[in-house]
Swiss-Prot record:
Catalytic activity: a (3R)-hydroxyacyl-[ACP] = a (2E)-enoyl-[ACP] + H2O; (3R)-hydroxydecanoyl-[ACP] = (2E)-decenoyl-[ACP] + H2O; (2E)-decenoyl-[ACP] = (3Z)-decenoyl-[ACP]
Species the sequence originates in: Xanthomonas euvesicatoria pv. vesicatoria (strain 85-10) (Xanthomonas campestris pv. vesicatoria)
Gene3D superfamilies for this protein: Hotdog Thioesterase
Enzyme Commission designation: 4.2.1.59, 5.3.3.14
Name of the protein in its database record: 3-hydroxydecanoyl-[acyl-carrier-protein] dehydratase
Entry-linked SUPFAM superfamilies: Thioesterase/thiol ester dehydrase-isomerase
Subunit (UniProt): Homodimer.
Pathway: Lipid metabolism; fatty acid biosynthesis
Length: 171
């Protein structure tokens, strides 16, 4: 498939099945672990570091799977799912630029949670800025990201790292 600058939910689910890019390329997780509904912008230029950016959105509905179990009587989106979305987007960026292999989260520097996503929210927006791409034996991207709910920043993460591996046997 030709690189695009936006992707619909159906296209993202095709990525999970290995149908969007080359069959042996990186994949997004399938439902329910896919943590965004669309990519509204992706570019290998721009962003705060001038090395690329990814913008994505998740529509919040009270019936989302995690609200029913986290927590009963006090529903809130787990913070780790927002963080995972940032890793998912970083891995998608690597696949989108043509990096071979399967993506794996390698860590991050600093993470801050200053708010929460409740069932009454409408929209989560992710803004991921690529700060570094290493293209050697290991292909890796490093990004800085933030997550906004209804326009208010609630999570930030610095130095998110995702690597691409042609074999994950000994990972």
């Amino acid at each position: 498939m030709t690189r695009q600058s936006t992707y619909s939910r159906d296209q993202l689910l095709a990525s999970a099945r290995g149908e969007l890019f080359a069959p042996d390329s990186g994949r997004l997780p399938n439902d329910p672990m896919l943590m965004f509904d669309r990519i509204t912008e992706i570019s290998d230029a721009g962003g705060t570091h001038g090395k690329g950016l990814i913008r994505a959105e998740l529509d919040i509905r009270p019936d989302l799977w995690f609200f029913g179990c986290h927590f009963i009587g006090d529903p809130v989106m787990p913070g780790c799912l927002g963080l995972d979305a940032m890793w998912q987007l970083t891995g998608f960026f690597l696949t989108w630029i043509g990096a071979p292999g399967r993506g794996r989260a390698l860590g991050c520097g600093e993470v801050k949670f200053t708010g929460q996503v409740l069932p009454s929210a409408r929209l989560v927006r992710y803004e991921v800025d690529v700060s570094r791409v290493i293209n050697r034996k290991l292909v890796m991207a490093q990004t800085d990201a933030r997550m906004l709910v209804d326009g208010r920043e609630i999570y930030t993460a610095k130095d998110l790292r995702v690597g691409m591996f042609t074999s994950t046997e000994n990972f």
